[in-house]
């Protein structure tokens, strides 16, 4: 990366990387350091929040689902300490509903895994007008409902009874929906 491209980062080049996939985290940290960032890494929500409390970074790349909780907790903590920070949320589950939640919590952008270092750098450095336009074809109500059911189902560790209780629906109704939409 040329020196003029480093200037685009500004004087504070601190970058927090939070992901529970150690191999991915190590590779990404190395790639981002080559691009001029000064990286700090964390593998859990609690470690990420501790780094934010100690010294809030100018940039952050945070995985949505971590072993000890939701990456949005780190996004929220960083927004409180440093409102102007540029935050990209990564996830293996590219659902529109979670993207909206991440942006509402203060994320600058949302990328699905596997995202390469160039995509992440572009998202971190994108100016407001450079952000992609919203999709032209919004999701159908049925699709939104299915994603919500899937999200609650995963939150309940795939326990049908608990999921049905949280969704206020009969267990057998939920089982039929899951059976109908599940891949065969």
From Swiss-Prot:
Post-translational modification, as annotated: Phosphorylated by RegB.
Protein name per its UniProtKB record: Photosynthetic apparatus regulatory protein RegA
Gene Ontology MF, one: DNA binding
Function summary: Member of the two-component regulatory system RegB/RegA. Involved in transactivating anaerobic expression of the photosynthetic apparatus. It is a transcriptional regulator that is responsible for activating expression of the puf, puh, and puc operons in response to a decrease in oxygen tension.
Keywords, comma-separated and alphabetical: Activator, DNA-binding, Phosphoprotein, Transcription, Transcription regulation, Two-component regulatory system
Domain Response regulatory residues, every copy: 14-128
Residue list for modification 4-aspartylphosphate: 63
InterPro entries according to UniProt: ActR_PrrA_rreg (IPR047772), Bact_response_regulator (IPR050595), CheY-like_superfamily (IPR011006), Sig_transdc_resp-reg_receiver (IPR001789)
Gene3D superfamilies named in the record: 3.40.50.2300, Homeodomain-like
